[in-house]
């Protein structure tokens, strides 16, 4: 029997106009998350954003090969498997980005000479895959009880470039700043969702 | 033309650090900062209030608060590192400010000094047994750490045996070491666990719940069948009853009682007691 917490959250804010860069209001797709669904890994989570779904499993702190051990902190490994085909260069670059994020957040110095492995499997891809992978990895690390100094999440945003404005670097920078601001505002929604789903899980005990 | 760009945002440490007292019993997330009671008075509404310097230094009562699992000290605040419910225990003898800890649910065990665990012997090399305790490395157990063991009188331990012992050395930098005697040299229930019976794994939170001082589950299980049971803090339980069927029933009940409410449990026990 597995402990499952199904938590759905619908976050809608006002949508900006079509072609112009996104304003402060943003609309995120429907979220759902399930924790502790796999019996073998120490922590697991499945994260759904609209139609994109990623399954994450965390093993750790576990034994590490002598060639890979680091004397004063934990060795973090991320494995990302695409839905079809063998992992390629794009997966490797995403793995590196996720690993850098996790390393900044996980307190590796508490478990030296051990390994923490995050395995991500893409179940379906309908946009913003990297953001969904980051969210699933974070929920799986929390489920496994790996000590962390903060939580992290991912929000994807797209830049629309109009013909005339591409040439002007400053307004391009402006658009980037607007994207960053919108993503930061949206990340508060994701954190609120994390809190609600974890409270629901612990409210049963 | 659209270029996707992903932004990974790290959670800031909440809007404001909350007082630990107000969060007791609630779910806390990694990254939250908690204020200890003595700091609450200093951080009044509005933060940057100037306090007049007093010439006679008021006896600042420094209360010693112990940071338990799931919490770390960062500066003069507590940083939450695991997700779970915040708990507090008042100090017994009156000194110190008590213990704060986070009650989290975990499957993976990390060795802690003084914990009693069930291990499986995996190798025998010279005078040392290697015992798998479910952590990141196997613990070492010397053959002299059994009651009445001498160099001539070696204990009868084979590869694959179950051992119930406690850790004497368990920190992040060294290989864990366990022994099967207490500080007086007596076995006190530790040592090789006998024949038959069933070993199974549960979460660490369930073990702590079952080992709590007044746990109804164990009393009810004891009334059901005569049994022998050993709890290891590493999530392993060994149980033995008269017949194999009873042993399996007990194992299933203990695994399932993590997710059952007390009413469902009483129903199942009454049904089993009838049959």
From Swiss-Prot, chain B:
Residue numbers carrying N-acetylalanine: 2
Record has Hydrolase as a keyword: no
Cell division keyword on record: no
GO CC terms in record: cytoplasm; cytoplasmic exosome (RNase complex); cytosol; euchromatin; exosome (RNase complex); nuclear exosome (RNase complex); nucleolar exosome (RNase complex); nucleolus
GO MF: 3'-5'-RNA exonuclease activity; RNA binding
Cross-link Glycyl lysine isopeptide (Lys-Gly) (interchain with G-Cter in SUMO2), where in sequence: 151
Keywords from the UniProt entry: Acetylation, Cytoplasm, Disease variant, Exosome, Isopeptide bond, Neurodegeneration, Nucleus, RNA-binding, rRNA processing, Ubl conjugation
Biological process, per Gene Ontology: CUT catabolic process; DNA deamination; exonucleolytic trimming to generate mature 3'-end of 5.8S rRNA from tricistronic rRNA transcript (SSU-rRNA, 5.8S rRNA, LSU-rRNA); isotype switching; mRNA catabolic process; nuclear polyadenylation-dependent rRNA catabolic process; nuclear-transcribed mRNA catabolic process; poly(A)-dependent snoRNA 3'-end processing
Predominant place of localization: cytoplasm
InterPro entries: Exosome_RNA_bind1/RRP40/RRP4 (IPR026699), KH_dom_type_1 (IPR004088), KH_dom_type_1_sf (IPR036612), NA-bd_OB-fold (IPR012340), RRP40_KH-I (IPR049469), RRP40_N (IPR048541), Rrp40_S1 (IPR037319)
Localization: Cytoplasm; Nucleus, Nucleolus; Nucleus
Disease entry from the Swiss-Prot or TrEMBL record: Pontocerebellar hypoplasia 1B: A severe autosomal recessive neurologic disorder characterized by a combination of cerebellar and spinal motor neuron degeneration beginning at birth. There is diffuse muscle weakness, progressive microcephaly, global developmental delay, and brainstem involvement.
Described purpose of this protein according to its UniProt entry: Non-catalytic component of the RNA exosome complex which has 3'->5' exoribonuclease activity and participates in a multitude of cellular RNA processing and degradation events. In the nucleus, the RNA exosome complex is involved in proper maturation of stable RNA species such as rRNA, snRNA and snoRNA, in the elimination of RNA processing by-products and non-coding 'pervasive' transcripts, such as antisense RNA species and promoter-upstream transcripts (PROMPTs), and of mRNAs with processing defects, thereby limiting or excluding their export to the cytoplasm.
PANTHER family per the UniProt record, alphabetical: EXOSOME COMPLEX COMPONENT RRP40, PNAS-3 RELATED
Similarity section: Belongs to the RRP40 family.
Subunit organization: Component of the RNA exosome core complex (Exo-9), composed of EXOSC1, EXOSC2, EXOSC3, EXOSC4, EXOSC5, EXOSC6, EXOSC7, EXOSC8 and EXOSC9; within the complex interacts with EXOSC5 and EXOSC9. The catalytically inactive RNA exosome core complex (Exo-9) associates with the catalytic subunit EXOSC10/RRP6. Exo-9 may associate with DIS3 to form the nucleolar exosome complex, or DIS3L to form the cytoplasmic exosome complex. Exo-9 is formed by a hexameric base ring consisting of the heterodimers EXOSC4-EXOSC9, EXOSC5-EXOSC8 and EXOSC6-EXOSC7, and a cap ring consisting of EXOSC1, EXOSC2 and EXOSC3.
Protein name per its UniProtKB record: Exosome complex component RRP40
Annotated organism of origin: Homo sapiens (Human)
Protein encoded by which gene: EXOSC3
């Amino acid at each position: 029997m597995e402990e499952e917490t199904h938590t759905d959250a619908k976050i809608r804010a006002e949508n900006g106009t079509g072609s112009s860069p996104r304003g402060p209001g943003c609309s995120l797709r429907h979220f759902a998350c399930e924790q502790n669904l796999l019996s073998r890994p120490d922590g697991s989570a499945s994260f759904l954003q609209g139609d994109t779904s990623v399954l994450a499993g965390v093993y750790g702190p576990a034994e590490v090969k002598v060639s890979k051990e680091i004397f004063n902190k934990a060795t973090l490994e991320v494995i990302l498997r695409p839905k079809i085909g063998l992992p390629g260069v794009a997966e490797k670059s995403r793995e590196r980005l996720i690993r850098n994020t996790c390393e900044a957040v996980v307190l590796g110095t508490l478990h030296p000479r051990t390994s923490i492995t995050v395995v991500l499997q893409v179940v379906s891809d309908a946009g913003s895959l990297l953001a969904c992978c980051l969210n699933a990895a974070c929920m799986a690390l929390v489920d496994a009880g790996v000590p962390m100094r903060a939580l992290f999440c991912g929000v994807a945003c797209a830049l629309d470039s109009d013909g005339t404005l591409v040439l002007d670097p400053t307004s391009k920078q402006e658009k980037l700043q607007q994207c960053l601001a919108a993503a930061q505002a949206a990340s508060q929604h994701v954190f609120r969702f994390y809190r609600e789903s974890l409270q629901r899980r612990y409210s049963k005990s | 033309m659209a270029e996707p760009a992903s932004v990974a945002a790290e959670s800031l440490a909440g809007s404001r650090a909350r007082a630990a007292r107000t969060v007791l019993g609630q779910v806390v997330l990694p990254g939250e900062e908690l204020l200890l009671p003595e700091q609450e008075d200093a951080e009044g509404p509005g933060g940057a209030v100037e306090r007049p310097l007093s010439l006679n230094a008021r006896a600042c009562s420094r209360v010693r608060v112990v940071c338990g699992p799931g919490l770390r000290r960062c500066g003069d605040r507590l940083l939450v590192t695991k997700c779970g419910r915040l708990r507090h225990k008042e100090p017994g003898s009156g000194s110190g400010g008590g213990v704060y800890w986070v009650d989290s649910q975990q499957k993976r065990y990390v060795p802690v000094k003084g914990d009693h665990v069930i291990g499986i012997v995996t190798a025998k090399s010279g005078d040392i047994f290697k015992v798998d305790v479910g952590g990141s490395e196997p613990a070492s157990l010397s053959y002299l750490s059994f009651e009445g063991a001498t160099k001539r009188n070696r204990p009868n331990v084979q590869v694959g045996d179950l051992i119930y012992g406690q850790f004497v050395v368990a920190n992040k930098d060294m290989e864990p070491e366990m022994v099967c005697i207490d500080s007086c040299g007596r076995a006190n229930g530790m040592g090789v666990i006998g024949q038959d019976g069933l070993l199974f794994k549960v979460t660490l939170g369930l073990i702590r719940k079952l080992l709590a001082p007044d746990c109804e589950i164990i009393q009810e299980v004891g009334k059901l069948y005569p049994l022998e049971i050993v709890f290891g803090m590493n999530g392993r339980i060994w149980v033995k009853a008269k017949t194999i069927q009873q042993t399996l029933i007990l194992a299933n009940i203990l695994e399932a009682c993590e997710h059952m409410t007390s009413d469902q449990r009483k129903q199942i026990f009454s049904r089993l007691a009838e049959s």
